[in-house]
Curated annotation (Swiss-Prot):
Binds 2 coenzyme F430 non-covalently per MCR complex. Coenzyme F430 is a yellow nickel porphinoid. Methyl-coenzyme-M reductase is activated when the enzyme-bound coenzyme F430 is reduced to the Ni(I) oxidation state. Its EC number is 2.8.4.1. Coenzyme M binds at R120. It holds the Pfam family MCR_gamma. One of its GO terms (molecular function) is coenzyme-B sulfoethylthiotransferase activity. It comes from Methanothermobacter marburgensis (strain ATCC BAA-927 / DSM 2133 / JCM 14651 / NBRC 100331 / OCM 82 / Marburg). Keywords: Cytoplasm, Methanogenesis, Transferase. This is Methyl-coenzyme M reductase I subunit gamma. It is found in: Cytoplasm. GO terms for cellular component: cytoplasm. It comes from the Archaea. The MCR reaction has been shown to follow an ordered bi-bi ternary complex mechanism, in which methyl-SCoM must enter the MCR active site prior to CoB for a productive catalysis.
């Protein structure tokens, strides 16, 4: 599916896989629905979904052709409020990274908005749909418990060196490596509020697996300049955008 991303390297193929909605993401761990709710921190487990408007079927909306054509997502049907999950990804071969996340989210998920900065990436959608999306993002190859962080605020650390256990720095210490079990536990929700019980995020991926799954070009992995096709396409886009900006005839 070359239209998703150019390149002939494994990194390029991994980017295409994430962005291709027909590609089945590899499931690497199991996280319960209740634990996903705890991680997000938007509502208590078992609490009803707060709403911002009545269910669509109860609203007297004017006739609209687009509304008839587009099937609303479940949360919109129910009137859920919009909520978010935000990730940060270590530059040390994390499986995903911000711009790839945004491209992939927009290709895979309806009714969601994605926002990207250099070291963080947020996705917003209706609350019950967000929980389904978050579960998939946490359980699959999008996420590694040591090199990926769920951080609603104070996200800094993606470019810092890893600690002695291979964990990415987090000033709020939301994800902790348990040396006794060899597994990572989330002890605070994404905003930094302490959880009553830690959530088991599973074992960190080993370095070989990370190198195989990463979407990050690095000189000590697969260097971007060595991916000739990707470089040629990006240079072409840059030149055409620059020329277009000058409004050349």
């Amino acid at each position: 599916m070359a239209q998703y991303y150019p390149g002939t390297t494994k990194v390029a193929q991994n980017r295409r896989n994430f962005c291709n909605p027909e590609y089945e993401l590899e499931k690497l761990r199991e996280i319960s629905d209740e634990d996903v709710v705890k991680i997000l921190g938007h509502r208590a487990p078992g609490e009803e979904y707060p709403s911002v408007h009545p269910p669509l079927e109860e609203m007297d909306e004017p006739e609209d052709a687009i509304r008839e054509m587009v099937e609303p997502i479940d949360g919109a049907k129910a009137g859920d409020r919009v909520r978010y999950i935000q990730f940060t990804d270590s530059m040390y071969f994390a499986p995903a990274q911000p711009y790839v996340r945004s491209r992939a989210y927009l290709c895979r998920y309806r009714g969601a908005d994605a926002g990207t900065l250099s070291g963080r990436q947020i996705i917003e959608t209706r609350e019950r749909d967000l929980e389904k999306i978050s579960k998939e993002l946490l359980e699959t190859e999008f996420f590694d418990p040591a090199r990926s962080g769920v951080r609603g605020k104070s996200v800094h650390g993606h470019s810092l060196r890893l600690d002695e256990d291979g964990m990415m720095f987090d000033m709020l210490r939301r994800q902790i490596y348990n040396k006794d079990t060899g597994r990572v536990e989330m002890v605070k929700n994404q905003i930094g509020d302490e959880l009553d019980e830690p959530v088991d995020l599973g074992e960190p991926l080993d370095e070989e697996t990370l190198m195989e799954k990463t979407t990050i070009y690095r000189v000590d992995g697969e260097a971007y300049r060595d991916d000739v096709e990707a470089v040629e396409i990006m240079q072409r886009i840059h030149v055409l955008r620059s020329q277009g900006g000058f409004n050349l005839e």
